[in-house]
Amino acid sequence: MNGYFKLLLILAVAFALWTYWLKPEQGSRSLELYSPIENVQQVEGYTITSLEPYAGEFRVLARENYRMGREAELSPVDFALGWNEMAKPEVYKQLSITQSNRWYYWRYENNPPIPVNDIASSSANTHLIPANKVVAKKLADIDADDMVYLKGQLVEVKSADGWTWRSSLSRTDTGNGACELMLVEEVREISSL
């Protein structure tokens, strides 16, 4: 039994090393040949189709990194983004904002700081696909509360086995399917709190 325990421990340590230090950077390694001019890209078994350009200045309300799952191969981070009133600290700081399992959640105590419909239609969970390693590094350096400029494409991703991940094309929708899936070509930090 002692030998079995040692083998199990060695395998666990080897997996941890591979996962955290030796595994290639996720979300950037395969897009080095990405060309923003083309509407459709073939990347490591995925077809990435640009649906429409997407750009703007946003407040990062929260961020969540992902290392596991098919989606993490392309999108290693989600930003909960706010614009209009939801970009103002005096508004969003009155909310409890969390992210989990590729969803963004908010709640308030007593009364909402702005109408609930405005909260929902002025914020979104955005799955970010870095177009290259430079963009991936810049996204990794962005923190919650930063004001950022993002530019890229809303996309649909498909694989040969039928799996599909498609961006919402509306800024005012809510619920399942309302997240933006963005291929980020440019990112710039405007300010931080």
Label each residue range with its predicted role.
Residues 2-193:
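OB-fold and OB-like single-stranded nucleic-acid-recognition modules
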